[in-house]
């Protein structure tokens, strides 16, 4: 581990010199690339330097303890040695996590797809609740949300919605939301007060670069139609909405958010590329934990990653067995506590996997 950390520190120092070089600054594209590399290494280098400093302080204090004869001073030195030992142990754990292989998609923007599953109209209303939850979470994080396509019901539910989230670390945090979400509550339309169980499926896809996936124009069919609003009413008098069908796979993507047909086509192509990229990833390794195919399933009630229980004010994530009794704030975007716990569990599993090799 130390050999690798020394290499990273040397690389960081080399980059520090390069990004201050006027000849490199003149080439903005190259300079920005080097600045990005430099920023990515900064956290681990700072932690490593703190770790080395604590090691040196520990050795100095041990030396002082060996030479000290005063009882009170020896007790103080022993307390300091224990404190430094705790710091070193903590820094070692932090460095191990920072050295874990990074998901290449973590710094990308994302497409979020939410569909009502089992439960009919109530499932569509729950899909709308989840959409609001992620929209509020994005606002808290300072991310930007753009609707790509929406199929709404007459009473405000969402049969299906696709939206894009743009911002720092969007995929690294939202990727854990892929799966089937279950809600238990008394619907507004239920006169007997019976609790109903419904589901909605969430899929989180990273935005892909043009170099990541190439779409042959001969493999797609593009249809245009008039955009519709809530309940299906027409909201546009021109054929601005776009539907793209990828003929080899049968994947279909629609976009009607923009008034411009060209902009809708561009957005739909981005979603299509992300879906094709995800499909290629699934075929390359069917066991990848983040695959939507494995996580989302069919939307059946028996498949779930999280339950939202309204009568108890409870949200439970079944992957880590974590329960929070703050449903209202959770649905209002306060979801970091569970996401942080999922990230910690993911990191622990990766460390365990590396340690068993």
UniProtKB/Swiss-Prot annotation:
Residues 283-309 are annotated as: Disordered. Pfam families: PCRF, RF-1. It comes from the Bacteria. Signal peptide: none annotated. GO terms for molecular function: translation release factor activity, codon specific. Residues 283-306 have a biased composition (Basic and acidic residues). GO terms for cellular component: cytoplasm. The modification N5-methylglutamine is found at residue 233. Keywords: Cytoplasm, Methylation, Protein biosynthesis. It is found in: Cytoplasm. Methylated by PrmC. Methylation increases the termination efficiency of RF1. Belongs to the prokaryotic/mitochondrial release factor family. This is Peptide chain release factor 1. It comes from Clostridium kluyveri (strain ATCC 8527 / DSM 555 / NBRC 12016 / NCIMB 10680 / K1).
């Amino acid at each position: 581990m130390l050999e690798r950390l020394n290499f990273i520190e040397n690389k960081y120092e080399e980059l520090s010199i390069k990004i201050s070089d006027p000849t490199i600054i003149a080439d903005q594209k190259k300079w920005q690339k080097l600045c990005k590399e430099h920023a990515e290494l900064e956290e681990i280098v700072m932690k490593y330097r703190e770790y080395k400093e604590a090691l040196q302080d520990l050795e100095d204090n041990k030396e002082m303890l060996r030479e000290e004869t005063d009882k009170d001073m020896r007790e103080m030195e022993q307390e300091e040695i224990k404190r430094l030992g705790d710091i070193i142990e903590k820094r070692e754990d932090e460095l191990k996590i920072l050295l874990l292989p990074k998901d290449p998609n973590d710094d990308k923007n994302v497409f979020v797809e939410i569909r009502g599953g089992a439960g009919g109209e109530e499932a569509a209303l729950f899909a709308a609740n989840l959409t609001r939850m992620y929209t509020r979470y994005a606002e808290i994080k300072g991310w930007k949300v753009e609707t790509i396509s929406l199929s709404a019901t007459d009473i405000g539910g969402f049969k299906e919605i696709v939206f894009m989230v743009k911002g720092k670390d969007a995929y690294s945090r939202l990727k854990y939301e892929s799966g089937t979400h279950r809600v238990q509550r008394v619907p507004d339309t239920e006169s007997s007060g019976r609790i109903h169980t419904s589901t909605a499926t969430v899929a989180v896809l990273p935005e892909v670069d043009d170099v990541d996936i190439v779409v042959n124009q001969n493999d797609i069919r593009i249809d245009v139609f008039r955009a519709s609003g809530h309940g299906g009413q027409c909201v546009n008098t021109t054929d601005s909405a776009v539907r793209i069908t990828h003929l080899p796979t049968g994947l279909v993507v629609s976009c009607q958010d923009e008034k411009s047909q060209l902009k809708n086509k561009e957005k739909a192509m981005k979603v299509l590329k992300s879906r094709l990229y995800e499909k290629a990833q699934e075929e390359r390794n069917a066991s990848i934990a983040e695959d939507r195919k494995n996580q989302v399933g069919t939307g059946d009630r028996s498949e779930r990653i999280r339950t939202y229980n309204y009568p108890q004010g409870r949200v439970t994530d079944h992957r880590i067995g974590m329960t929070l009794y703050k449903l209202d704030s959770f649905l209002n975007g306060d979801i970091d506590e569970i996401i942080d716990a999922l990230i910690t569990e993911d990191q622990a599993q990766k460390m365990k996997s590396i340690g068993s090799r």
